[in-house]
């Protein structure tokens, strides 16, 4: 879709929804709307039902973690309008305590997307019919896609053939932890990385 058509759509949505749209941004041929959490249901309903929009497909809901922000999470809704041949992205900011209204009443397919976002990031959705983990184990501690989640996790899960059940154990690293220097992609490290001995010698 052309930038001009997206610009017209952005203007139309802002005119119709007013203060429910905090920001409408066009970048890289895509339109992104930033919306307060309290307005997400009315905005999604409008985008689905309005004749000029007809975004009837919710293709994904995902999370993004920005730990340096007060509202550290973005909940991102990806919508598609087959009739208009358009896509749009809607973003809501939340923190660990902010309840984001569930989109299930508007898009029934949102149920598992929201469960995944809860499981991976810990974002809470109010009014969700079954908000529980979907990808991790029931006893899993933490939310693995948060930036502050340890790379190794908290526990190791494996099947114990002697006990004939899954067991949880403290993490045991099979190799020594390696600290790679990624501060500058343009400058090399001061030390020789494993496997680079020949390259550094030349």
From Swiss-Prot:
**Which compartments is it annotated to reside in?**
Cell inner membrane
Keyword terms of this UniProt record: Cell inner membrane, Cell membrane, Membrane, NAD, Quinone, Translocase, Transport, Ubiquinone
Q: What task does this protein carry out?
A: NDH-1 shuttles electrons from NADH, via FMN and iron-sulfur (Fe-S) centers, to quinones in the respiratory chain. The immediate electron acceptor for the enzyme in this species is believed to be ubiquinone. Couples the redox reaction to proton translocation (for every two electrons transferred, four hydrogen ions are translocated across the cytoplasmic membrane), and thus conserves the redox energy in a proton gradient.
Recorded family membership? Belongs to the complex I 30 kDa subunit family.
Q: What is this protein called?
A: NADH-quinone oxidoreductase subunit C
Q: How does it assemble?
A: NDH-1 is composed of 14 different subunits. Subunits NuoB, C, D, E, F, and G constitute the peripheral sector of the complex.
Entry-linked NCBIfam families: NuoC_fam (TIGR01961), PRK06074.1-1 (NF004730), PRK06074.1-5 (NF004733)
Reactions catalysed:
a quinone + NADH + 5 H(+)(in) = a quinol + NAD(+) + 4 H(+)(out)
One Pfam family hit:
Complex1_30kDa
- Molecular function GO labels: NADH dehydrogenase (ubiquinone) activity; NADH:ubiquinone reductase (non-electrogenic) activity; quinone binding
How this chain sits in the membrane, per its record, is:
Peripheral membrane protein
One GO location term (cellular component): plasma membrane
Enzyme class label: translocase
Enzyme Commission number, as recorded: 7.1.1.-
